[in-house]
Every structure is written in structure tokens, then in C-alpha cells.
Amino acid sequence: MNHSEVKTGLIVTAKQTYYPIELSNAELLTHYETIQEYHEEISQNVLVQSSKTKPDIKLIDQQPEMNPHQTREAIVTFLYQLSVMTRVSNGIFFHAVRFYDRYCSKRVVLKDQAKLVVGTCLWLAAKTWGGCNHIINNVSIPTGGRFYGPNPRARIPRLSELVHYCGGSDLFDESMFIQMERHILDTLNWDVYEPMINDYILNVDENCLIQYELYKNQLQNNNSNGKEWSCKRKSQSSDDSDATVEEHISSSPQSTGLDGDTTTMDEDEELNSKIKLINLKRFLIDLSCWQYNLLKFELYEICNGMFSIINKFTNQDQGPFLSMPIGNDINSNTQTQVFSIIINGIVNSPPSLVEVYKEQYGIVPFILQVKDYNLELQKKLQLASTIDLTRKIAVNSRYFDQNASSSSVSSPSTYSSGTNYTPMRNFSAQSDNSVFSTTNIDHSSPITPHMYTFNQFKNESACDSAISVSSLPNQTQNGNMPLSSNYQNMMLEERNKENRIPNSSSAEIPQRAKFMTTGIFQNTGELTNRASSISLSLRNHNSSQL
């Protein structure tokens, strides 16, 4: 046998054929009509299961090594890159992150085992769903082998791939992933078939993006073939007379062709809008995995926030495809919080996510539009805060002006006769009517407070201190006639009894300390007791007797 006659094995030359669009549409329509009968029961079951499997953010915050505020962005980014490299289908990444959050709610995750945990979560999610999130596909035997479409072929990552991408055989081996899978299943009580966010966001026909892209290509081919046919038609009619050309322009077939072109353009625009909508929904679903604060909300609340963003920036009227809980409508505060979290997530989109979605139709313009909206919103908030601050300053200034004017009109002094405060002296402007003056002024000055002059009183203080203004009795009663001397002595004894020495009424009273004869305390004539703003330390009673 010659070498050329040796068979090299089976050579597959068959090509995948496109899945018939008519067949997929008929299957989807049948499924939609059948499922409507159980729509309420399905919606209620999804709400119960999603609430049951919701991660506990309070327990996740207690992770000693994997603090979510510091490590979530890095670990979710690694998990997303791992899902892209292993080519799992749409929705598996979100499901894997959900497994990781639920596991962190019950177990402590060590930092050197984080990649092992998230890799196992991705492997478990791919096997749970089979990568087939479409009614046409089957979990065991998905479409895609013979046909191209209606969605990508299901793929489960191999253990060798997970070992390679998670650090190599020096860190992990295949048996460690198998052991971790069993450990995660035991931790989650084998309750791994939980509702997905795709059940709220994506309709059954929106899961087969390939079908829409194929239909778009067919329309483009038909349009190109139509243009070629029109060019041939023009070349054939170039030999006609002018009258024949004019009749051809004014004839009905030409107008019918214009209507056909308009219909085709509208159909293309509608198809592009549908493809853009599907891409936006997938982008927001993947983006939500990075937003740790979204774990505080229910699944349907997150979906409402996503639809509010889609409707705002695409001018559409979209809503969840499952029923909302009865009597528990989302309040405006919750919707505002979710909206703000997602907007901030879009503005700060992870580079790895943008790198994958930048080729998708409508994603980059959407991100730029959201960034412009956020920038304008920040400017408005800054302007509003500035205006509010200006108003507060104006109100405060008017308030102080009114107080100043009312105080200057109602009373000439800020101090009343019953106050116990001693004002500081104004050195810059000498006043005859001051605390330190020796002349008696009947009327108070509008600048200096009204103080009482007094005679020399016998001090019975134990520490031989000077008599202060606050300890002196008022010579008048409520501004009326002067009181009698007996009454004054009674008042003095009553007020000065705390300064008396017990059982020593006949004790010798030391001499009073005199002010210095220089500086601002210099007095002429008879010495009178004046209250000063500075407390003078005087000699004690024992030293005065020596």
C-alpha cells in the first residue's frame, strides 16, 4: 500500500446550517401562548425562590480576609475574565457571582483560595444551567452542533482549563475543584437552581440574539441584491427614448418601489433598535455583578432600576416580564437608590467589561450618553448647593442685622443691672463713663455698661479678697427710691455670709490690698473699690496677721 493510500481518519467537511427563523418563531409563539396560563404561578414562585436564596450582605461584611469593599472588584473581574476565556454562554457569569455571594454569606473565604472558590462557582453554574437559557434548547442536548443558532452552543469548562486559568498546577489541581464543588453544594444545601435575573429582563425571544443578527444579514443581502437589480434595470432603460423615461418615472411601479424602500428602512431601524435593546440588557446584567450595594435589594427591585435607565436613555417603554409582588410596590426612595447605583456603575464601568462589549451595537454611545447625563447632573447639584448656601448666608445676615437694630433701639447696653459678667475694658477709646472711672454717672452710656458705684464696705472674707461687683447689693429696689441703711446692712450680711470665717466674728481683719499706682489702675483722691476684668491675687489671711 502506497503512502498516499493511507487513510488519515475522518475529515469533517460539513458546515453548520442556519437555524430556520420561521421555525424558531413558531416555537417561541407556541411557548408564549402556553406559558400565559401559568404566568401568575411562575411569577410567585420566582419571587419566593429569589427571596429565599438572597445573599446576606451583613454576613458578607464580616469576611476577615475577603472584605467586599476592598476585594470585590478584583475577584469579580477575574471571574468575568474566566467566563470569557472559557466561553460560557450568556447568564452563567451572573449565576456564578450569585453562588459566590451566597457562599460568602455562610463560609469564610481565605484570600489564597478565592480563585478556587470562584472558579468552582463558574463550573457549577455552567453545569447547573447547561449553558442553555432558551426554551428551544435542551439541557442535555443543546442545539448548535448541526445548526448555527438560535443561540450559542452550550459549553461547560473543563477542569484542565480551570486549573490553568486559576494559577496552574503549582497552586491547584483537579481534585481540589471537585472537593470544593462538593463543599459549596453542602453549604448551599444543594439548592442551586435559583431564579435568574434574565427571567425578569430578557424575554424568550431576546435570548436568541443570533437569530436577529442573521435576519439583519438577510435584509442587508436582500437590499444589496435589490440595488443590483435596480442598477441593471437602469442600464437596460438607458437606450429608451426620453418619453419612455418620463413615463417610467411617473408610473406606479416607481412609486411602489419608493414605498418599499421606506418600509425596508423602517424595518431595518426597528431591527437595529431590537438588537441594541438586547445588548443593553445583557450589559446591565453583567455590570450589576460589580455593584455590591445592589445585594441589599430584591431581584425585582434591581430589574425595575435597570428598566428605568433603559427607558430614560432609549425613549422606550420597557418593563419586567414577570409580575411584581402584590401590595409591595417599589417606593420612590428605593427606586432612586437603585437608579443612582447603576448610573455610577455605568460611569465607572470596569475596563474588562467595556473591552468585551465595545464591539456590540449601541453600547459605547449608551455609556457616553450616561456619562454626559451624570456630568450635567453633578453640575446642577453643585449649582443648587451653591444657591442654597448663598440663601443661608443672606438669611443669617438679615437675622443678625435685625437683632443688632432691635438691641440698639430697645436697650442702650448689652448688659443689664442684674448680670454677673464683668466686661473687658476698651483701651482704644477712653470713656469717662467706664468701669474704672471714679465719678458717678446717673445715666448709662450706650457704649459702656451701667455699673454701680459703691462705698467702702467691711469685708469679712476668709481669704481677704476684694469685693466684686456681683457680690454688692443694689442701692435701689427696681430702680426706685434708695433703701434704708438697716436694710442695706441686712442685705450685705445675707449676701456675704459665705465669705465669713466661722465663729470668728471678732477676728482681726487684715488690711485690704491696694491697687498699683501705675498703669491703668492708677487712681487719684480717695481709694474706691472697683471691679476689674483681671482677678488680682492677694495675700492670704495667715500672712496678713504676721
Swiss-Prot record:
* GO MF term set: cyclin-dependent protein serine/threonine kinase regulator activity
Provide this UniProt record's keywords sorted from A to Z: Cell cycle, Cell division, Cyclin
Please give the PANTHER family that the UniProt record associates with this protein.
Answer: CYCLIN N-TERMINAL DOMAIN-CONTAINING PROTEIN 1 (PTHR21615:SF2)
The similarity comment for this entry is:
Belongs to the cyclin family.
Instruction: Quote the function comment for this protein.
Output: Essential for the control of the cell cycle at the G1/S (start) transition. Interacts with the CDC28 protein kinase to form MPF.
What is one process in the GO biological process aspect for this record?
Answer: cell division
Cite the residue spans of the region called Disordered.
224-265
GO CC terms in record: cyclin-dependent protein kinase holoenzyme complex; cytoplasm; nucleus
Tell me if Cell division is a UniProt keyword of this record.
yes
Miscellaneous remark of the record: Present with 319 molecules/cell in log phase SD medium.
Which SMART domains would you find in this protein's record? Answer: CYCLIN
Q: Does the keyword Oxidoreductase apply?
A: no
**UniProt protein name:** G1/S-specific cyclin CLN1
- Listed transmembrane segments: none
The record's listing under CDD domains reads: CYCLIN_ScCLN_like
What residue ranges carry the coiled-coil annotation? none
